[in-house]
From Swiss-Prot:
GO cellular component: plasma membrane; proton-transporting ATP synthase complex
Protein name as it appears in the record: ATP synthase epsilon chain
GO molecular function annotations of the record: ATP binding; proton-transporting ATP synthase activity, rotational mechanism
Localisation per UniProt entry: Cell inner membrane
Coiled coil: none
Lineage: Bacteria, Pseudomonadati, Thermodesulfobacteriota, Desulfuromonadia, Geobacterales
Keyword annotations from UniProtKB, A to Z: ATP synthesis, Cell inner membrane, Cell membrane, CF(1), Hydrogen ion transport, Ion transport, Membrane, Transport
Length: 138
């Protein structure tokens, strides 16, 4: 059994992460899950949420948009629409997006064609605000 997981995280635009990590957690379609070295092969879809990993005793956090997460032979492949590291998120911009999405949603009903668009924008902004507030910890 390997002692580390090899993680490759990519978006359609760039490779965001290529690291060997001790453990990783993410938000799947059915809830949060974690992966350690030696995990069985696994494939799931991801929803808007947080990805966290530990490397050498330090926690790192990222905000993710929808995508896929695969584990095979101690290699984790993550393909997502967008990914932002906690220290790269502009907190004021994320808070402004959260406020705009809240205002738009209040004016809509679930039957409106744009309701789901603003609901997803609200989810993204909320995750970005939460992740931006997490400092790297030992």
């Amino acid at each position: 059994m390997a002692e580390k997981l090899k993680v490759e995280l990519v978006t359609p635009y760039k490779k965001v992460l290529s690291e060997e990590v001790d453990e990783i957690t993410a938000t799947g379609a059915l809830g949060e899950f974690g992966v350690l070295p030696g995990h069985a092969p696994f494939l799931t879809s991801l929803k808007i949420g947080e990805l966290a990993y530990r490397k050498d005793g330090v926690s790192h956090h990222m905000a993710l948009n929808w995508g896929y997460f695969e584990v095979e032979n101690d290699t984790v492949t993550v393909l997502v629409e967008t990914a932002e590291k906690a220290d790269e998120i502009d907190l004021e911009r994320a808070k402004a997006a959260l406020g705009r999405a809240e205002v738009e949603l209040k004016a809509l009903t679930p039957e409106d064609k744009n309701f789901r668009i603003y609901e997803a924008a609200l989810e993204r902004a909320l995750i970005r605000v939460q992740v931006a507030g997490k400092a790297t910890r030992r």
